A protein has these predicted regions:
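Bacterial N-terminal signal peptides that target proteins for export
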Residues: 1-8
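Non-globular targeting/processing and membrane-anchoring segments
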Residues: 10, 23-25, 39, 76-77, ...
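C-terminal segment of classical bacterial N-terminal signal peptides
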Residues: 13-22
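Cleaved targeting-peptide boundary
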Residues: 22-33
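Thiol-based oxidoreductase modules, predominantly thioredoxin-like and allied folds used
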Residues: 30, 53-70
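Short pre-active-site segment immediately N-terminal to redox-active cysteine/selenocysteine motifs
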Residues: 31-37, 80
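Typically the conserved alpha-helix immediately C-terminal to a functionally engaged Cys/Sec
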Residues: 39-54
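A short, hydrophobic beta-strand/beta-hairpin element that forms part of a small beta-sheet core
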Residues: 80-95
Length: 128
């Protein structure tokens, strides 16, 4: 029984480790409570982003600027919210500071995803 408990704890710890680090391609959305632009993104983009071709390549993960942060090599500090940081293998590829509208967001994220290595972009259709 003790061995089983140790095995379960070990497996659970191994599964939780990737949550602490940004790996593969993902879009980190740094946000804070009370941010009106974060709320606008949540309303206009959030519901469909992870199901879009861009979201399949770089799913979004919410990061509270006042909470625990993933281990990512950022090019500069996070100052504004929202700030969207595209990362690949825990390294910043590029970012979008602020949110104005759906069209600007998707146009900019398309450009950023185009900077990913080809293997990371493999889920993106040629038409986007």
């Amino acid at each position: 029984m003790r061995l089983l408990r140790i095995l379960i704890i070990t497996v659970a710890a191994a599964l939780a480790l990737p949550l602490a680090q940004a790996s593969a391609a993902e879009l980190l959305m740094y946000r804070r409570d009370g941010c009106p632009y974060c709320v606008a993104w949540d309303r206009e983009v959030g519901p469909g982003y992870n199901n879009s071709s861009f979201g399949k390549v770089a799913p979004v993960r919410m990061v509270d600027v006042h909470g625990a942060r993933p281990q990512v090599a950022l090019k500069s500090p996070i100052i504004y919210t929202p700030t969207f940081v595209l990362v690949d293998e825990a390294r910043e590829i590029g970012r979008i500071e602020g949110y104005s509208n759906n069209d600007f967001f998707y146009g900019t994220i398309a450009r950023l995803i185009g900077q990913l290595p080809a293997a990371a972009r493999s889920g993106l259709s040629a038409s986007q």
